[in-house]
Each structure stands twice: as structure tokens, then as C-alpha cells.
Swiss-Prot record:
Keyword Isomerase: no
Gene: Tktl1
Name under which the protein is recorded: Transketolase-like protein 1
InterPro entries: THDP-binding (IPR029061), Transketo_C/PFOR_II (IPR009014), Transketolase-like (IPR051424), Transketolase-like_Pyr-bd (IPR005475), Transketolase_C (IPR033248), Transketolase_N (IPR005474)
Active site: 339
CDD domains registered for this protein in UniProt: TPP_PYR_DXS_TK_like
Subunit details: Homodimer.
Compartment(s): Cytoplasm
Provenance organism: Mus musculus
Amino acid sequence: MSEAEASSGMAHNAGPDEKTLQVLRDMANRLRIRSIKATNSSTTSYLIPCSNAEIMSVLFFYTMRYKQEDPENPDNDRCILSKGLPFVNVATGWPGQGLGAACGMAYTGKYFDQASYRVFCLLGDEESTEGSVWEAFAFASYYNLDNLMAIFDVNRIGHSSSMSVEHCIAIYQKRCEAFGWNTYVVDGRDVKTLCHVFSQAAQVRGKPTAVVAKTFKARGMPNVEDAESWYGRPMPKERADAIVKLIESQIQTNKILVPSPPIEDSPQINIMNICMTSPPVYVADDKVSTQRACGLALAKLGHENDRVIVLGSDTKNCNFSDIFKKEHPERFIQCCIAEQNMVNVALGCSTRDRTIVFAYSFAAFFTRAFDQIRLGAISQININLIGCHCGVSTGDDNPYHMALEDLAMFRAIPNCVVFYPSDAVSTEHAVYLAANTKEMCFIRTSQAETAIIYTTQETFQIGQAKVVRHSDNDKVIVIGAGVTLHEALVAAAELSKEDISIRVIDLFTIKPLDIATIISNAKATGGRIITVEDHYPEGGIGGAVCAAVSMEPNIVVHNLAVMDVPRSGRCNEALDFSGISSRHIIVAVKCILMT
């Protein structure tokens, strides 16, 4: 045992009596029975709860404080498992994601809510091979999350074979302690010890707690317990019925335990309907990158509501999130270069509507966290992700930093709103709209400094495009966003000198797409559309527009996109090299008019 055992005072002063311990054992066996019946009714058999039944019994009916009738109560203790259930706010899916979300919940409880609720996360031993687990371990230790407990269910069996370290509990203990966690080693079947350790952990200050519990897969099931051959296999009904009867014979009481009520000390908050109390302050002659405008907008938003928080991955000096940090230092969370954990922490912070979360990093690096992002959508979590350094317009940076796949990635996420602002004014509106949107949002920003297109009085809506240049003589529509919109406007000005008029549309949101505006303007210009995007052709603006007009006769779409791996260079050189500069737009317009 660790130093925590020397602490005096326990959450349950005298510990549980023998009657309570027996009830906890009986409840664990009822969990086993329900697990067997539930999994045996499907075509596979994942008897995971059989190994951790005692842990769950003690956790939910002795240690945790919550109101059963009010699972979303902000004062309830939190628990992270692998399903999105009333008491489990985050779907974690494939192993390795739950602890990061638990870190976000614990950080919110300790530093933002400053409340008494605690956070518990149950992990399988197989999860310990995931790097994201240790990203979370480092985060929790650095921020002294003493309201967080991670419980390892070490049953030694993985999906297809035993774990490499099997039941070498000391290895898990050393790893946890190396990250600065208060660590206990316990027999996961011993409810008395579990009660004692869980209570002692509540007294530890200044560091998170890890409980390494030795357990056995399919615990309590003769000829199945600790066997490697049963993972994922359906169990014959006769055997399952016999095992259920055996476990039922071990239950001595029908009593149940009622959890202790939570300590009601979470603050009342309001994160709804945040208004832009003053318009953007840019003037027509300004040249501002959208990622700088995003940093300024976040800082401004932070003054509108004190529950706005920003998470960074050690890129604040590159993407201007340091502006927010300077003005609201207590609400900026440095997650370091650990993007998977940053997204998981963001998911945890946003649960139960306790904060308005923005996670800001290079858009290219969000590819590392795609699994976390897609599971955030499954959990229906409201987080806002901001990607900077998008496209070849990043220029002098190398291709590794140039996000050219991000639109495809976020367009594939269900119910995700994808913003692509083209100037500082529209960027500020995108930030405020995202803050008020109860779905996942992605804001795509660029490094290139661009002109101000819109007046400070312009209004924006999700799914509403802007026709920024038009005339009655327009022959072609050019659709762009971000830097390519500016290239389209340059091309339009040059073409006008040759008496060629084109219409220019700014999409603003790529998802949802303003299909009505696209189709109506296409019909008014002879059904000719050119899309221009600082993105690979797959999954970007061109694909979205093609899908939108696919059922419309007599509309033709030509797509200009980055067709190959880019090179470093000045912004204008990179755009021209990739075939998406104003020069290439002019050529495309003339070609389409000749056909």
C-alpha cells in the first residue's frame, strides 16, 4: 500500500460492517448474472463485468455519491466506463480513451467548479498498451488531480491472447508510481479491501490515485474463469443456465444499498445564448490571418462568459491562442504535444454542460485524434475544435504542417458543423456561432494574412453562404472559402478587364452547405461552377458541391484543388504551384466558357 494508508479519517469512518460487505458481495454476483444473461442473448459473449463485479459493486453502492433519480446532477460523482449511459457521459469505444475524458471532468471539478464531486475511471489492463493512457497519466499528475481515481482491472486476458505482463501486478504499480500517482495494489475480489482503499484515496491530497486490482476474467464461472478461449464466444445455453444457478446459490440476501447523496456545492452556471455584445473592430484596410482573428475572438468571447475555456497543444505562440491565455490565464489548459489526450480532456470538460470548450491546434495534428473525435460525436458531446495552418497557403512551413485532409475528416463526422471563414470578421462570427451550437464544431483557419471582405455590421448564419461579387452578366460561379476566396476575387477583377463577369460565392460553412444558394446562382449563370480549395480534392469543397447539385440537370462542376504533395515556399508561390491561384482560376474560367 502507499503513503495514503497512513492518512487518518475515512469517507466511511468505521468502514463497512459484515452485513454491508455481504450485500456488496451479493450485488457483485447479481451483476455477474446480468452480464451472463445479457451477453448470452447476443451472438458474442464479452463477460467483462464478471472480472470487475466487486469493483463496480463497491464503487457504485459504497464509494460514489450521487442521486440515482438525477443522473445528470452536476454534484454527482462521475464514472467513466465504455458506454454512453446515463451515469457515463462519454463513449470510449476502443480502449485507451476513458482516462483522458476523466481527466477533463476532474480538471473541471477541481479548478472551474471547485466542487466536491470525484471522478472514477475503470480501465482494462489491455488499455495500458495504449499511449493515450499515459498521456492522461502525465496530465493528471502535472495538474495534481487528487479528485481522480483510475482503477486497473488486471485480469491478464486480452482480445486474442494473454497480456504480455499477465498478472505481474508490480509492473503496473511501478508504472503508475513513475508518473507520480498515489498507487494501491489490491485483490479485486476482496470487497473489504476495496472499500478501505477507495475510502482512503479520498483523503489523498495533491496527486491522483491509481488502484491496481488483480482480477480474473469470467470470475465465478467454472471451467471458464481465467480461460483464454472464451473471449467473444457465445456460451451454450445449458452451461450458462448452470452457471447462473451456481452464482444464485451464493447470494445470501435480497437487500440493496442506497448510494450516499452528493455534496451540493457545484456553482450554478449558464452557458446558453452568448451574445456578441459589440461588433468586430476591423477596418477595410486591415490584413489579418483568420487564425489570428480566431485568437482575438476567443479572448473576446472569454469576457462574455467565464465558462469559456481553451485547450492547447503547445502551439499557442503559433496560432494566437496565447491572446486568450494572457487575458484569461486561469481558463487556458496546456495539454502539451498530446493531441489525443487534448481531445479527450476537452470531451470530459464539456460533459454536463459545465464549460464551453475550444481545443486549438494545428489542423494536421487532429488526424492523430480522429478516433477520439468520432467517439465524441457518438457521445453527442459539444466541443469546438479549431484547426490552424490549413492548406498550402501555410507557405514556409513544411508539408507535414499543411492540413489538406481535415475537411474530409470533419465532414465525415455526424452532425459536425464545419466552418471555413474567409476573413477576420467572418472568423469572429464563426467563433460565436460555434459557442452557441450544441453540436461538435470545427473551424478551419489559415496562416496567410488576408484582406477584410465584410463590414463589421455583416451578419452570419450556419448553413448560409455569401454572394460576395455578382452582376447580371455573370457567366460562371467560382466558389471558394478561406484564401481561395481572395484568389477568386482577384481573378474576377482581372477577368472584368476582358469583359468577362464571374460570380463569387463564399461558403462560410462547408457543412451544412447552402445548397439553395449554390443551385439558384448556378442556374442564373448557365450552370457553370468552378470550386477552388486549399485542400486535396477528396472530401473537400468540390466533393460537397458536386454532391449538392448531383440531381440537378445542366449543371457542371469543375474542381481546382491541391492534386499532389505540396512543397514549401511563399504563400503565393505555393498556391500557384498547387494550381489554385488566381492565375489558374482565370485559365479555368476561360476554358469552361470555350466548351
